[in-house]
């Protein structure tokens, strides 16, 4: 169970990372910071630091004396054991000599520890219980030590004022100036700090005092130089007390080092740095202040930036010049090529154009005589307006160009790249590139038909079946009742007769065969009837072959000899039977023929009856005696089976 303590009780206080430390429960005075609830204000012996701790971290001194009261290597621990026994009422207001009179081995360490603790309390930084934490020299000896946690509060303001008035009255000005000088050393080189720390850890007290005296002498030299350079008088005022101060003032000067452990070794590197640097002005500027160094760095950075910017500008200008030269050379080459082509193609140029174009030639100051001679035929070929525009552009370019010396330098640079330019020209010649500018109207007109022809070639040709369907629709449209177009129908029938039609295509498009049959009986125009019969016979001959042709010839001979209309009707019957075999059914074809006959008119009913009778008689005769029709039917059926 945690015990209840009163102000003045002696205890062992435990903090993380430290042994049980001899301490005293302190009394809270008026105006001081009050401790948080359930915590006590603690005063540590040996280091004279304060903190707020809970009762669980406090142990009575008398009970735990044998357990925790053993000597330890920690700085300030053995002094704390001595203080808790011989001087339990010790506080920060006591002079440093009161503690050092009893023990000759620890006088300077205690005084430095007290001053360090007081300075840390004044600055409001974290307070550490050991003297090794307050100074980097003492920390170097104890490598295994870890810093104690920072205290949450600071000691009472009354105690601070008393102690500061008692100890630092004579040296207040010097200490403040030294603090300023230490703050000026924020920008010292990083390389010097590890060397100084190593040296301080290995040196003893005498070496420290000797180093301080060296630093004082160095400071005095710096101040003299600063006076010569008319620097601020604050540094000179800091040098006079530093020279007159005795060895007893060494702990007072250590106070800012304890407060700022990282800045402690500042005076030592200044002396060494000056020896290495030969220029006195740089030494004085390094020792003046961080502001001066920052300004110097800024100036250097600005100078470097300016130099870099100037270099970049120069490089950009050179690149632009090179590009301009390359463009000029390319233009000259193109013009020369054009001139050569123009001489070959257009040898006879108009004299009037040459006279009009001649005056702008001498205005080109930068161009050489050779280039002018090469440009003359080119100008004669081009129109006047384009030449005037080019003359203006070349004037602007001539004004923007640099001197002839710059051109010579650029040409020398350009000669290093002859291979690249030669490659470019060869590629352009192969491609046949024109010079920069809009193409002429003649060339545009030439290009248009080429593109149109290419597009036409890309289009696919229609198939035979598509052509057949198209012609079929044209024939139907041409033979309308309202407005028939006989010539269009004849042209379509002629094209249809020229098509390479197969039996498979006809089987798919039976409507075409049916329309041809109907057109054969188109009584409105005899030429259409004859053309339809001719086309029909052509298609039939292609499908059935040469045997059918021979049979047709024999039939035609018989027809011409007899000239009987009945026989003509009989041949029509044969053709109808063949058509039916092509379309696949005899009965359906007969029904069609009957329907066509009914449409012819009422006046032809008697003729139709006689035709039907003759057909029946002919059919009976064919059945009794196999004639040409039976042979044709057999051939058609055999072809259908093979297909």
Swiss-Prot record:
Q: Which SUPFAM superfamilies match?
A: HIV integrase-binding domain, Tudor/PWWP/MBT
Q: Where is this region: Disordered?
A: 88-450, 548-643
Extract the SMART domains matched here: PWWP
Coiled coil (UniProt feature)? 295-345
One of the protein's GO biological processes: positive regulation of double-strand break repair via homologous recombination
Mark out the compositionally biased spans (Polar residues).
194-204, 549-559
- Provide the alphabetized UniProt keywords: Coiled coil, Cytoplasm, DNA damage, DNA recombination, DNA repair, Myogenesis, Nucleus
UniProt biased composition (Low complexity): 90-104, 232-249
Q: Which InterPro entries match?
A: HIVI-bd_sf, LEDGF_IBD, PWWP_dom, TFIIS/LEDGF_dom_sf
A Pfam family it matches: LEDGF
Composition bias, Acidic residues: 176-187
Localisation per UniProt entry = Nucleus; Cytoplasm
Q: Which residues form the PWWP domain?
A: 7-64
Spell out the GO cellular component terms annotated for this protein, sorted alphabetically and separated by semicolons: cytoplasm; nucleus
Bias class Basic and acidic residues marks the residues at 107-116, 209-231, 290-353, 373-382, 417-450, 560-575, 608-622
Q: What does the sequence similarity comment in the record state about its family?
A: Belongs to the HDGF family.
Q: What does this protein do?
A: May act as a regulator of myogenesis. Promotes the repair of DNA double-strand breaks (DSBs) through the homologous recombination pathway by facilitating the recruitment of the DNA endonuclease RBBP8 to the DSBs.
Protein name per the record: Hepatoma-derived growth factor-related protein 2
Q: Which organism is it from?
A: Xenopus tropicalis
Question: What taxonomic lineage is listed for the species of origin?
Answer: Eukaryota, Metazoa, Chordata, Craniata, Vertebrata
């Amino acid at each position: 169970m945690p015990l209840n303590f009163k102000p003045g009780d002696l205890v062992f206080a435990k903090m993380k990372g430290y042994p049980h430390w001899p301490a005293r429960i302190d009394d809270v005075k008026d105006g001081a910071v009050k401790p948080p609830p359930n915590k006590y204000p603690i005063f540590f012996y040996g280091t004279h630091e304060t903190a707020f701790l809970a009762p669980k971290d406090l142990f009575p001194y008398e009970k735990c004396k044998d357990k925790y009261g053993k000597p330890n290597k920690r700085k300030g621990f053995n002094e704390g054991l001595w203080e808790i026994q011989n001087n339990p009422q010790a506080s920060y207001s006591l002079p440093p000599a009161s503690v050092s009179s009893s023990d000759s081995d620890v006088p300077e360490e205690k005084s430095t520890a007290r001053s360090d603790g007081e300075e840390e309390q004044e600055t409001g930084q974290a307070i550490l219980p050991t003297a090794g934490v307050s100074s980097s020299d003492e920390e170097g000896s104890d490598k295994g030590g870890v810093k104690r946690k920072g205290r949450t509060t600071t000691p009472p303001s009354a105690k601070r004022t008393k102690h500061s008035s008692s100890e630092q009255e004579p040296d207040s000005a010097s200490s403040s100036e030294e603090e300023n000088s230490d703050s000026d050393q924020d920008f010292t080189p990083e390389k010097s700090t590890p060397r100084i720390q190593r040296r301080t850890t290995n040196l003893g007290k005498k070496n420290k005092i000797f180093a301080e005296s060296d630093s004082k002498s160095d400071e005095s030299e710096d101040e003299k130089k600063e006076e010569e350079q008319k620097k601020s008088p604050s540094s000179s005022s800091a040098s006079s007390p530093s020279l007159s101060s005795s060895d007893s003032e060494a702990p007072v000067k250590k106070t800012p080092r304890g407060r700022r452990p990282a800045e402690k070794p500042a005076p030592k590197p200044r002396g060494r740095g000056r020896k290495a640097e030969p220029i006195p002005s740089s030494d004085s500027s390094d020792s003046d202040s961080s502001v001066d160094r920052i300004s110097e760095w800024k100036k250097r950075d600005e100078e470097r930036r300016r130099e870099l910017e100037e270099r970049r500008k120069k490089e950009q200008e050179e690149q632009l010049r090179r590009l301009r030269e390359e463009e000029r050379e390319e233009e000259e080459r193109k013009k020369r090529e054009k001139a050569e082509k123009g001489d070959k193609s257009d040898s006879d140029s108009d004299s009037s154009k040459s006279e009009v174009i001649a005056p702008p030639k001498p205005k080109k100051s930068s161009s050489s005589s050779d280039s002018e001679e090469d440009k003359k035929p080119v100008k004669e070929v081009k129109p006047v307006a384009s030449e005037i525009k080019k003359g203006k552009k070349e004037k602007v370019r001539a004004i923007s160009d640099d001197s002839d010396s710059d051109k010579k330098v650029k040409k020398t640079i350009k000669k290093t790249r002859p291979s690249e330019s030669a490659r470019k020209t060869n590629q352009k010649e192969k491609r046949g590139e024109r010079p920069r500018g809009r193409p002429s109207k003649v060339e545009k007109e030439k290009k248009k038909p080429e593109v149109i022809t290419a597009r036409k070639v890309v289009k696919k040709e229609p198939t035979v079946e598509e052509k057949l369907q198209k012609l079929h629709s044209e024939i139907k449209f041409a033979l309308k009742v309202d407005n028939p177009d006989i010539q269009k129908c004849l042209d379509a029938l002629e094209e249809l007769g020229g098509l390479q039609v197969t039996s498979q295509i006809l089987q798919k498009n039976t409507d075409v065969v049916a329309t041809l049959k109907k057109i054969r009986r188109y009584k409105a125009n005899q030429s259409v009837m004859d053309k339809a019969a001719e086309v029909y016979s052509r298609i039939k001959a292609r499908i059935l072959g040469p045997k059918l042709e021979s049979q047709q010839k024999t039939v035609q001979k018989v027809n011409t000899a007899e000239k009987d209309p009945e026989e003509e009707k009989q041949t029509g019957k044969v053709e109808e039977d063949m058509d039916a075999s092509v379309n696949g059914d005899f009965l359906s074809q007969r029904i069609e023929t009957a329907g066509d006959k009914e449409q012819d008119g009422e006046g032809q009913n008697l003729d139709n009856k006689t035709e039907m009778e003759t057909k029946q008689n002919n059919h009976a005769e064919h059945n009794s005696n196999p004639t040409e029709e039976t042979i044709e039917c057999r051939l058609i059926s055999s072809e259908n089976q093979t297909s």
